[in-house]
Every structure is written in C-alpha cells, then in structure tokens.
Amino acid sequence: MATKSCELVLCFFVFFVISFSAISVSAQTCDNTTGTFIPNSPYDKNRRLILSTLASNVTAQEGYFIGSIGIAPDQVFATGMCAPGSERDVCSLCIRSTSESLLQSCLDQADAFFWSGEETLCLVRYANRPFSGLLVMDPLGAIFNTGELNTNQTVFDIEWNNLTSSMIAGITSSSSGGNNSSKYYSDDIALVPDFKNISALMQCTPDVSSEDCNTCLRQNVVDYDNCCRGHQGGVMSRPNCFFRWEVYPFSGAIDQINLPKSPPPSVTSPSPIANITKNDSRISGGKIAAIVVVTVVTIILVVLGFVISNRRKQKQEMDLPTESVQFDLKTIESATSNFSERNKLGKGGFGEVYKGMLMNGTEIAVKRLSKTSGQGEVEFKNEVVVVAKLQHINLVRLLGFSLQGEEKLLVYEFVSNKSLDYFLFDPTKRNQLDWTMRRNIIGGITRGILYLHQDSRLKIIHRDLKASNILLDADMNPKIADFGMARIFGVDQTVANTGRVVGTFGYMSPEYVTHGQFSMKSDVYSFGVLILEIISGKKNSSFYQMDGLVNNLVTYVWKLWENKSLHELLDPFINQDFTSEEVIRYIHIGLLCVQENPADRPTMSTIHQMLTNSSITLPVPLPPGFFFRNGPGSNPGQSNSKSFACSVDEATITDVNPR
C-alpha cells in the first residue's frame, strides 16, 4: 500500500513537472522602415524614460497601458501588456526585461516591438508616431520549432485547423469590454489521435477593433502554415497580435488551459527554434528556459496573498488615465534627494514643488501633494486627467505621476526661470523684462489658452490663470501651469456652474465669484488681468490712489482710459524699444477682456487676431467687472458700488507667490 502511495505521489509529481515545463520564446523586432534616431538624442532619452516606467504603468492599469511622452519630433509612443491573470510581480518583471532587451537590441530604430514569454507572455512596443487603434501588419516576427511532427499530417491538420479557427472566432465574437489585456485573448488545447496535445495561445492588443484582430490573427495562422507547416510548433507575432502553438504546455497559457483527459506525453526536450526574417526587420531570437517547479501549497499561498493585497490596493487607487506615465516612488525620492529642502522650488495651495534629476539626466519638477489636504486628492486626479491629454509648447509638460501609499506626486518638465511673477513684481528683476519680451510672453499665453479652448482634443477651461501659474523657460517663453482647477467641456458645452468656487481673487470673473458660473470667457477675464499686470508691472490685488480714491488695478486702468492717459500705466522699467500706439492697443485689448458681461468679452481666437493684426479696429470697451472705488477713509476690502455674496472654499483660494 505504501509503495502504491509513493507511486501515486511520484506520478503526480512527474505530471506536475511535465505540465509546467515550458519554453521561453523571445524575438525583438526592430523596424528598419520607419526611421532611425541618434543615440542619446532627445528622442532616445524620451524612449528610455517611458520604457523605464512602463512596468509600473502596466501593472497599475489592468495589465495594459498605452501612452506617450515628449513633444514632436521627439515624442515617443509606447504600450505594454501582459497576459490576463498574470501575477503583478511576474508581469512587472516581464515588462522590465522585455523593455531592456529592446533597448539593447534596437539601438537606433525609432519603431520596435517585442512579444516575450518566460513566466508569462508580455508585449512592449514603442514608436515615433501614434498607433492607438491602428492595425499594423508589418513587420512580422516569425519563429518555428525545428522538430518534425512525425505523425499523420492530414489528421493533424484537421485538428490544428479546427483549433485555430475556433479560437479566432471565439476571440473576435465574444471579446470582453474595455481596454484591458483580456479583451482579445484565448488559449486552448486539442488532442490529436495517436499524438501529443496541441497547446495554442492567441492575443491582440485591446486598442484595435474585433475585425482588425480577426484579420491579424488569421494572417498569422496563414503565415505559419506557409512557412513552417510540419514542424512541432512556432510563433507568429506582429505589433498588434500574437499566435503561438506547441506540442507541450507553455508559459502565458498553462494557467488558463484545461487539459483534456489523455495519457501524459512523454518527457522530451523541446526541439531547437529557428528564426525567420521578413519585411526588412531584424529579429533576434530563441532562448529556452525551464520554469522553476513550486509546490501546490506555495502556489495557493502566493495567489491568496496576491488577491488580498490586490483588493486592499484597489480600494486606495484612483481611476487615472492610461495616457500618463507612472513613476516609482523610489525613483522620485532619489531624483529629489528624498525631497530635501535645498531642492524645494516653492509652495502652492495644495503642496510643495521640488527640483529633481532622473538617472538619465532629465531635470524634473515634482509637485508633492500635501498629505493633510483632503481636497487635494481631487485636484491631483484632475490635473493628471487634464494635462495628460495636452501637448503644446506654451503648456508645461506632464511627464507622469506617482501614487503610492499616502504620496501623490506630479512629475513635470523642469522650467528653469521660475514663474512670471518672480520677475514681474520684483523691483529689481522686472527690469529684465523689456517690451519685446513682455509682448512675446503675452503672445505665448494667448496661444496656450487658445489651444486649451479650441485646438486641443478637449475643450478645457483653466480657471486659475495668474502670473504665478505662468512659468518661463530658459528663453523666457511662457508655459501655462497648474491644471488642478481645470475643467473639461463637452464639444457643444459653453457654460458650467459649480457650488464650489475655486481660484485666486483678483483674477476670477464676476459671474464666477457671484454665481459659480464659468466658461471660456472666465479665462478671458483672467487673461485680461494678466495683460494689464504685464504692461504695468503692478499686481491687481494691490490698491492704487487716484483722484483721492482707492482703486484696484482694473479700476485704475479704467480711470486712465476715461482720462485718456493710458500711457501712465506703462511700467517705467520698460525700455524705449516700443511704440505708444502698440502699448495702448494691448491695454485696450486687456480692457475688452475684463468687461463685466461675459458676452461682451472677445474669444481667445479674436484676441489672437487683434494682437497679431494691427489693422483690426477694436471696439470701445465697457466698464469692467468688479468696478472698484473707495474713498480715502474706507476699508479697501469693501466696495461702495457693488457687493458680492458667495461661498468660497478658503482652501482653494491661493496667494500670488512665486513657485
């Protein structure tokens, strides 16, 4: 009896080893037809950056991630995917090793992909052009097992054709919803009489349509049949689809396949693998490795621990977009010297900003959300959602984010010259801003807002335009920053209302403060205030004496308009390289932007035309909103002409301080 028990245990162990023995197939496909890049160029740095963060993004996004980084022509698009059901750590390891293999194999190709499988199947792809939703059939990666079938080919073909056809039909007719790795995935097994089991796996990237997935997989099967019929297995891979079959179970599929009742196959070593080159692509391939056999108890414990950990993590995670890049917290801590004081750039309403440097030499600015700010989580999520979809030279570029434990971090490009208010309102630094520079700054801000309102994929209202949210690069070009308050509008939407007024006093439009109503014209009002501040070098929140009365900047400029003395507004630090007509025209446009009625304010498109075409006749402005006038004995914080009652969230009202 004891002998039989031992035999049963031994048989189970042998079957367990056979079932989990696997072959690892790898083929880096570097496309030589879509261009090359210079090593260590901006494109190469962006490529390395997005691939270095791909593993954390894939594991955070249900096993599938697609996104981009940089601005054309150095923009890099990338995607990563693991087979459904892959353990988080296994998936992460596969993506990391696959990315590293691509970096080592494709030294200067601007487009490459790699389906790799050891403990699981995973895909990594990058390109210099958008590819989401596009079916790409070239190049083809092909590998076949050199071992011969040595069976009745006719009988085998019937089973093989039935298996592949049913798998394709099943994938494309009953795909799961959403963009995740299980959308187009199938693995199955078939028994060939008097032969071994056929194990097969098929997968498409979830961004393509079911029709495109069908086309891609069918072509993979046809290509295998044309090149490799009669062999004991093989792989056909394209950028959007993958097909593999073997005469033994293999990684990426073994956990999902239900083995039919049949005699266990004989234990034989897999035959060598051959590589095929097609469509001017370079394929390196073929490595064989055995998966370490672990006990059933260990597997149960690992799976149980993973499920518990994953459930806890899901409760903490926020629904963030797949366009953005997720950084590991340790990477950010290392880049900022663990958020040291000497790296601190400034402090805002919801946290602090630090300068950092990544391992590849890229300088970054890290916005660290305050752990005590309950409202800040909403703004954090909002900023990632909004900025991830934007690409413009006059908008600060979001490189990614980190969301681990209590830490919520936004990673931006580093803009070297701080913010506009750092220069504009400093009595010694503002003399660096001559008229040409101020005019260029106004023009850049105009183009940035116009992109948000009209030219981007989304219609976005910033809601917090102010001098401290305009960053200046090394050439003093403006970049609009801080999208925590921004809102996305529908295509036909023009106005929205909120019960929670956020922003900065002095820049907020009257209808927003009094009624919570905001629109593109709210941003226009803020932009008008910015124009007046840039030309005068004065803060709108300060108070100015005129005719024995106390005025804010907008009211002060309006009185200058009425007295036909707008030239008095000009900052005395501006040099003589300007014409009074041009400066007065800019002030005139600023007054048009701050008119009380939103309908009277021009759109950003019209403003851009007014600024760039001096032949356009400007309409006469009407009195501004928040027309502010106090007697010398009055409290400057109270208006004699109008009073406003509103509920304003104090945590969202920010001071105008350098960042």
Swiss-Prot record:
Modified residues (Phosphotyrosine): Y412, Y512
Key words of the record: ATP-binding, Glycoprotein, Kinase, Membrane, Nucleotide-binding, Phosphoprotein, Receptor, Repeat, Serine/threonine-protein kinase, Signal, Transferase, Transmembrane, Transmembrane helix
Swiss-Prot/TrEMBL catalytic activity: L-seryl-[protein] + ATP = O-phospho-L-seryl-[protein] + ADP + H(+); L-threonyl-[protein] + ATP = O-phospho-L-threonyl-[protein] + ADP + H(+)
Subcellular locations according to the entry: Membrane
Main location: membrane
UniProt-listed Enzyme Commission number(s): 2.7.11.-
Phosphoserine modification, residue list: S468
Active site (catalytic residues): D464
Secretion signal, residue range per the UniProt entry: 1-27
InterPro entries listed in its UniProt record: GNK2 (IPR002902), GNK2_sf (IPR038408), Kinase-like_dom_sf (IPR011009), Prot_kinase_dom (IPR000719), Protein_kinase_ATP_BS (IPR017441), Ser-Thr/Tyr_kinase_cat_dom (IPR001245), Ser/Thr_kinase_AS (IPR008271)
Modified residues (Phosphothreonine): T504
Stretches assigned to the Protein kinase domain: 339-611
Cytoplasmic topological segments: 309-659
Binding-site residues for ATP, renumbered to this chain: L345, G346, K347, G348, G349, F350, G351, E352, V353, K367
Entries under SUPFAM superfamilies matching the protein: Protein kinase-like (PK-like)
Similarity field: Belongs to the protein kinase superfamily. Ser/Thr protein kinase family. CRK subfamily.
Protein name: Cysteine-rich receptor-like protein kinase 18
Organism of provenance: Arabidopsis thaliana
Lineage start: Eukaryota, Viridiplantae, Streptophyta, Embryophyta, Tracheophyta
